[in-house]
């Protein structure tokens, strides 16, 4: 699957002010949903299969947060779709970071180690770091990720937290396949 690139286009004219257009470029092969509004305007939206699990992912995140006592974030390939243990408006619908995109592409879980200096910041514009993260894979395709966020003064993650996130990613992936 491709990615969405953000571009700025400037149209210059000698006798008129410059026009600046901001556009999102969707990669070739990405599925789109096409809508029309009441005025007949056409709206293109990148299809997110994990978005269909939004309510389910939100419930799963809440149970996981209560069980582990750590903040949980679920993302599709582009945005945060579910949050538990933190204010939702702080993270919901925010764009995932390039470093999280890279992690998803590796298809391997991540666990922050004690004293680690290069921490994984999973969400753009939010100064929080992942303690454990795992990609969600369905039918051989990466469709998102789930993670515990590190909190101030929390103990380092152990095998139990790593296994919880890995199982959660596997379970959400299986739900996507059905």
Indicate residue ranges for each PLM-predicted region.
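A short beta-strand signature within small-molecule sensing/ligand-binding domains used
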Residues: 125-137
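Short beta-strand-centered segments at strand-helix junctions
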Residues: 13-25
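Short hydrophobic/glycine-rich mini-motifs in sensory/regulatory modules
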Residues: 40, 136-146
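Juxtadomain coupling helices with adjacent low-complexity linkers
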Residues: 51-63, 93-102, 110, 147-178
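Short Lys/Arg-rich basic patches
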Residues: 1-14
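Structured interaction and signal-relay segments at domain junctions
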Residues: 50-52, 58-125
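Short, basic amphipathic alpha-helical segments that act as recognition/interaction helices
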Residues: 35-47
């Amino acid at each position: 699957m491709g990615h969405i690139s953000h571009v700025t286009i400037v149209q210059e004219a000698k006798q008129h002010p410059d026009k600046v257009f901001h556009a999102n470029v969707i990669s070739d092969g990405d599925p789109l949903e096409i809508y029309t509004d009441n005025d007949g305007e056409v709206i293109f939206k990148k299809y997110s299969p994990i978005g269909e699990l939004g309510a389910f992912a939100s419930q799963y995140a809440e149970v996981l947060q209560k069980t582990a006592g750590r903040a949980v974030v679920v993302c599709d390939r582009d945005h945060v779709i579910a949050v538990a243990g933190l204010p939702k408006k702080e993270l919901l619908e925010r764009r995932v970071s390039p470093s999280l995109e890279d992690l998803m592409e590796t298809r391997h879980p991540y666990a922050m180690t004690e004293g680690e200096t290069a921490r994984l910041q999973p969400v753009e514009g939010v100064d929080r770091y992942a303690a454990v993260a795992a990609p969600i894979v369905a039918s051989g395709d990466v469709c998102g990720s789930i993670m515990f966020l590190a909190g101030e003064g929390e103990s380092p993650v152990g095998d139990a937290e790593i296994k919880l996130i890995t199982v959660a990613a596997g379970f959400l992936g299986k739900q996507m396949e059905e």
